[in-house]
Amino acid sequence: MPYFLAKTDPGTYSLSDLERDKTTVWDGVRSPQALQAIKAMHPGDEVLIYHSQGEAAIVGAARVISEPRPDSNDAKSWVVDVQFVRRFDQPVTLREIKESHQFDDWSLVRQGRLSTMSVPDNVVAWLKSKHVL
């Protein structure tokens, strides 16, 4: 199953908001590279939710529940519907990811402003070994 990561500013929309709402339309993605990730998502894919402000960290998981579609409010953007899955007991901080030096080529580390991306298999394996996934 493919994994993706989606960043959000918790002051705008947090994992707690998604938990309360149960589902949401994941929108606001504009960069071409991030849009490629949105367009690659399919129902059942897992999305790691990353808070980009405060302590930058992967804080929980959601699941894609729709096929990608054009954003009816923004002709240059695409959206997917996601459903809350769970909050992680222990967030995985960007600092921890960077300090491992195992993922220096991952977009999360290399392209700090990229909002949505795929998660490489080696990152998924590492998160599973930490009992996060």
Residue ranges and their predicted role:
Residues S14-V29:
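Short, basic/aromatic beta-hairpin or loop at an interaction surface
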Residues D27-I38:
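Short alpha-helix capping/helix-loop boundary micro-motifs
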Residues L48-I49, R63:
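Hydrophobic beta-strand signal
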Residues Y50-A56:
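Short, charged beta-turn/beta-strand-edge "cap" motif at the junction between a beta-strand
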Residues A57-E67:
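Short beta-strand-centered aromatic/proline hotspots
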